[in-house]
UniProtKB/Swiss-Prot annotation:
Gene Ontology CC, one term: membrane
Principal location class: membrane
Locations listed in the record: Membrane
Bilayer topology: Multi-pass membrane protein
Tissue: Expressed in the spleen. May also be expressed in other lymphoid tissues.
GO BP, sorted A to Z: adaptive immune response
Transmembrane segments: 25-45
Positions bearing carbohydrate: N3
Keywords recorded for this protein, A-Z: Adaptive immunity, Glycoprotein, Immunity, Immunoglobulin, Membrane, Transmembrane, Transmembrane helix
Protein name: IgW transmembrane form Tm2T7/Tm7T7/Tm3T3
Taxonomic classification: Eukaryota, Metazoa, Chordata, Craniata, Vertebrata
Organism: Heterodontus francisci
Highest taxon, organism lineage: Eukaryota
């Protein structure tokens, strides 16, 4: 419980300038783009069939 509260405290502090946060945002952006491209690809394949 102590570890969880420490993590929550760090999240609440919101160190947006940290490298970890930049990597996290970049990772989510890449995942979002990949999922969007994948869904578009699947839709195109279904239409062609």
């Amino acid at each position: 419980e102590d570890n969880l509260s420490d993590l929550e405290g760090k999240e609440e502090a919101g160190d947006w300038d940290g490298d970890d946060n930049v990597l996290t945002v970049a990772a989510f952006a890449i995942l979002f783009i990949l999922s969007f491209l994948y869904s578009t690809f699947v839709t195109v394949v279904k239409v062609q069939q």
